[in-house]
Amino acid sequence: MRTHTVDHPLAAALLTTMRDERTPNAVFRAALCDLTGILVYEALREAPVDTYEINTPVAPATGARLAQPPLLVPVLRAGLGMVDAAAGLVPDARVGFVGIARDESTHQPVPYMESLPEDLAGVPVFVLDPMLATGGSMRHTLELLAARGATDITALCVVATPEGIATLERSGLPVRLVTAAVDEGLNENAYIVPGLGDAGDRQFGPR
């Protein structure tokens, strides 16, 4: 599995804003939106394009557009804050949804909804989730996508852990990871250290 960690001063500054426990919800959401844009930019760096002819106000020119916009799949609820930024950069993208909660006693993912196209053969997919902790939620999402024929999947995560990366590598599922940071690991409660806290709560308030 390929892992690309974004190395950019703006990404580092936005990540710092998100990490800071003093950051208000609205500022956290804005930083997540901006950082998502950077992750999408990096994820599309090698995307194939189609060329076509246009006319500028001065002369004819050859333009470019994405050959196939990705399907965006936010993992609810934390991934919801990444959708607008991703769709803003790729306005032709479709959006699917996967809902997964966390069992606080077992630290295991608890799926509760999915809304995805039935046939994803040949369709690039971007999974949006701010945090790759144990990797359980991401693995479940990847399994849903692979069962529908997806073979070109990119996970966009603000922070990841070695444990989460290992989970994806062991899964054998077709995925690459684009992240702003690989953190130290997980604590006894399976929270990322130093991490962001609960990304859903920090965007929308406690459940």
Curated annotation (Swiss-Prot):
Xref: CDD domains: PRTases_typeI (cd06223)
Stated regulation of activity: Allosterically activated by GTP.
Family affiliation: Belongs to the UPRTase family.
GO MF annotation terms: GTP binding; magnesium ion binding; uracil phosphoribosyltransferase activity
Protein name per the record: Uracil phosphoribosyltransferase
Catalytic activity: UMP + diphosphate = 5-phospho-alpha-D-ribose 1-diphosphate + uracil
Record GO biological process: UMP salvage; uracil salvage
The organism's taxonomic lineage, starting at the top: Bacteria, Bacillati, Actinomycetota, Actinomycetes, Mycobacteriales
NCBIfam families, A to Z: PRK00129.1, upp
Annotated function: Catalyzes the conversion of uracil and 5-phospho-alpha-D-ribose 1-diphosphate (PRPP) to UMP and diphosphate.
Cofactor: Mg(2+)
Binding site for uracil: 192, 197-199
Name of the coding gene: upp
PANTHER family in alphabetical order: ADENINE PHOSPHORIBOSYLTRANSFERASE, URACIL PHOSPHORIBOSYLTRANSFERASE, CHLOROPLASTIC
Keywords, ordered alphabetically: Allosteric enzyme, Glycosyltransferase, GTP-binding, Magnesium, Nucleotide-binding, Transferase
Coiled coil: none
Pfam families to which the protein is assigned, alphabetical: UPRTase
Binding positions for 5-phospho-alpha-D-ribose 1-diphosphate per the UniProt entry: 77, 102, 129-137, 198
EC number of this enzyme: 2.4.2.9
Co-factor remark: Binds 1 Mg(2+) ion per subunit. The magnesium is bound as Mg-PRPP.
Associated pathway: Pyrimidine metabolism; UMP biosynthesis via salvage pathway; UMP from uracil: step 1/1
